[in-house]
Amino acid sequence: MLLRIEDIDAPRVVKDADRWIMDDLTWLGLDWDGDAVYQSQRLDAYEEALRRLRERGLVYPCFCSRADIRAASAPNEGDGFLIYPGTCRRLSAGERESRVIRGDRHSWRLVVPDGAPADALGCASSHVDDAAQAMHAALAVGLPRVVCFADRVFGPQRFDLPRQLGDVVVRRSDGLFAYQLAVSVDDMAMGVTQIVRGRDLLRSTAIQLYVRRCLGSADMPEFAHLPLIDAADGRRMAKRLNSLDLGAMREHGDDPRAVVGYCAWLLRLVGEPRPMTPQELLPLFSWDAVAADTADRVVDVDMLLR
């Protein structure tokens, strides 16, 4: 397991949050290989990646504000994600250059292909290895309009880039590198082979696979997206639930084994919550069990803290 501290958004970084994360992991009985990687120390790598994208003509300056984009776009698929309408993509090269020289505030966006969708990207296969091989073959012949991958939990995924994602920001107008570029560069540099995260990032996976291809990589990690955890009122878990903050639980004297066991139960790996260590959980783990129930989970605080 690799530990990466994603502190690239400097204005939002909380002092000592990295140490809290490490302390929480240690308390749960989890460790990681090697030193933690800090994104704030890898700005040169992101700058180099952006330079390569610019050399290939795959990015362009965008002068639109968030208000401009909201006014010109409709939310996609009811989830609030805005598809950039391509306003600045249609500007002439001369107009783009003159506005940059003039100092107009701008971000940098990555171009996604237009044209007929490419269908041979692995979506027809439900097998992870078959999908990966098809994806590699399709990426080898050029930049795809359609990105597909087989998820360990949610199965085959297919994203039409211009229709569902649009030209994504890789450097923000405030000069900070965007999450999608930074994590893609880091995953390649760190040799990440398996990524497990929430289902709300399925769309991000398609973006990141495309970013990787634009940077010359056809390798595809194995992905597993998990159901989200909701509070009892049906809303997503948030920091407002201080009682479930791991640091607060540790200070309160709660048993970390109870947390691990409860998570195992949420993932349908055990029939009922019971205290266990990560080492005791390992032989019980099964992706088939996790994938058998993809509904979001609701946390019962009383059950967890009893």
Region annotations inferred by a language model:
Residues D18, L43, R66, F81, ...:
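Alpha-helix initiation and N-capping motif
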Residues M1-G78, D200, S204-A218, M276-E280:
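N-terminal Rossmann-like or analogous alpha/beta NTP/dinucleotide-binding catalytic cores
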Residues G115-A116, R235-R306:
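Non-catalytic terminal extensions that flank enzyme cores
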Residues W27, P75, G94, C214, ...:
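A structural signal for alpha-helix termini and helix-coil/disorder junctions
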Residues A67-A238, D245-R250, R306:
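Active-site cores that bind ATP or allylic diphosphates and position pyrophosphate for catalysis
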Residues R54-C64, P117-D119, H127-D130, P144-R145, ...:
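A short, terminal or domain-edge coil/loop segment
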Residues Q41-R56, G78-G86, H106-P117, W265-E280:
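Short secondary-structure transition/capping segments
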Residues D31, V59-Y60, G78-L82, G94, ...:
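A general structural signal for well-ordered secondary-structure junctions
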